[in-house]
C-alpha cells in the first residue's frame, strides 16, 4: 500500500534491521552481536536462506536460542524491607493491552492495527507522555511488518532506534519470553540513565494481541 517496489521494500527493511543489529552489538546479552549491514541482511546465502520471499532468515525472528530472563516486582515497602538500594528501582508507570480480531481474513486490511493504536496511545496518554518524550523504545520485532505497523499506529519514526535489545532476530527470539528480555534490558538502561522514560510493546498471535508499558526510575505521579 506504500507504493514500493520489491527492491525498494527490501532496501528499506534491511536498513531498519541493520539498525537493530547495531543495537544488538551493544547489548551484552544479545544472541547475535556481529553488527551486520543492510546488504548482508537482505542478500540470501548459505547462512541467510530465503524464508518467505522477499524476507531471508536475517529478517525473521530467531528462536534457535538458549536464553532466560526474570524480573522481580514488589511494592516500595517490600523493596525497602529487603534493603534494595533506590538506585536500582524502576517503576512501572502504565500498562495497557488490546486485542485485534483473531481471524486475519476479517480485518479491514493487513497494514494497520486498531488495537495497537488504541492501547498504545492510551498508554502514552495515561503516562502524560508523547512519543518525543520517550528516551528508549522497544517495539516487538518478530518480523519487519510488526515494527512498521506499530510505528505507524503510534507515530514513531522508523529513523529512531526502536529496540533496546537488538530485536528478535539479533537480540534473540525466545518465543513467548522475548518481552521479559526487553523489559529486563529496559530496566538496565533506565538504571544507567536516571529520570529517562522507556516504552515497551508486546505482541502475540498474527499481530493480534498487544500490550504496552511505560517505565522510569522516577515514581509515577499517580497510581499504576
Spans of features found by a protein language model:
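C-terminal catalytic subdomain
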Residues: 171-172, 176-224
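Conserved "HGTGT" condensation-loop signature of ketosynthase/thiolase-family condensing enzymes
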Residues: 1-78, 84-170, 188, 216-224
Amino acid at each position: 500500500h506504500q507504493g514500493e517496489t520489491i527492491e525498494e521494500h527490501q532496501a528499506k527493511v534491511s536498513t531498519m534491521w541493520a539498525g537493530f543489529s547495531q543495537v544488538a552489538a551493544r547489548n551484552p546479552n544479545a544472541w547475535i552481536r556481529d553488527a551486520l549491514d543492510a546488504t548482508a541482511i537482505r542478500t540470501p546465502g548459505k547462512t541467510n536462506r530465503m524464508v518467505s520471499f522477499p524476507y531471508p532468515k536475517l529478517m525473521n525472528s530467531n528462536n534457535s536460542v538458549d536464553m532466560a530472563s526474570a524480573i522481580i516486582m514488589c511494592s516500595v515497602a517490600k523493596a525497602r524491607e529487603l534493603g534494595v538500594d533506590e538506585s536500582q528501582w524502576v517503576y512501572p508507570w502504565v500498562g495497557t493491552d488490546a486485542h485485534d480480531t483473531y481471524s486475519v481474513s476479517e480485518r479491514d486490511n493487513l497494514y494497520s492495527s486498531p488495537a495497537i493504536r488504541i492501547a498504545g496511545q492510551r498508554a502514552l496518554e495515561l503516562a502524560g507522555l508523547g512519543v518525543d518524550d520517550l528516551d528508549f523504545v522497544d517495539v516487538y520485532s518478530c518480523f519487519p511488518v510488526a515494527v512498521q505497523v506499530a510505528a505507524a499506529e503510534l507515530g514513531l519514526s522508523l529513523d529512531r532506534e526502536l529496540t533496546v535489545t537488538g530485536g528478535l532476530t539479533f537480540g534473540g527470539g525466545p518465543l513467548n519470553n522475548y518481552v521479559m528480555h526487553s523489559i529486563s534490558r529496559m530496566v538496565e538502561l533506565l538504571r544507567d540513565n536516571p529520570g529517562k522514560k522507556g516504552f515497551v510493546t508486546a505482541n502475540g498471535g498474527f499481530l493480534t494481541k498487544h500490550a504496552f508499558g511505560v517505565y522510569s526510575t522516577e515514581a509515577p505521579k499517580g497510581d499504576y
